[in-house]
């Protein structure tokens, strides 16, 4: 059986590095994970990211703010908990324009070779699936550039796209 996760990352990138700002993850059963990194360098953000991402983050006193190490450990537990000890179960990761999201997620463990074996080495792309399905009408997005809101929206997209 496949256990699917839908996620989104907000990040700062400069062509050389992808610096995680926040990550939101939801599954098909209502479980959610949200975290904001205490370690991103906001000074490197372009004005658009400052305005559309950083200014919309929860206040620094919010418990969503965590170190990258804590995000990594808690995200791992969140992802593997439903399949732990269940032979034949595998995880799927889904995102919209998934490439950078996967890099931001995988870099929580450092080099790609350090990614735990339970976590997929790639993220399936909802945007590509949308093209493959003939671009059907999708639910409207709200709260853009909020990782958890976007992850929920990715699940709503999946609900439309999962059947041809």
Say what each PLM segment does.
Residues 2-96, 141:
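Conserved non-catalytic scaffold segment of RNase H-like nuclease domains
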Residues 15-17, 31-34, 108, 132, ...:
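Active-site-proximal flexible loops/turns
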Residues 100-120:
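Substrate-recognition/cap helix-loop segment adjacent to the acidic, metal-dependent catalytic center
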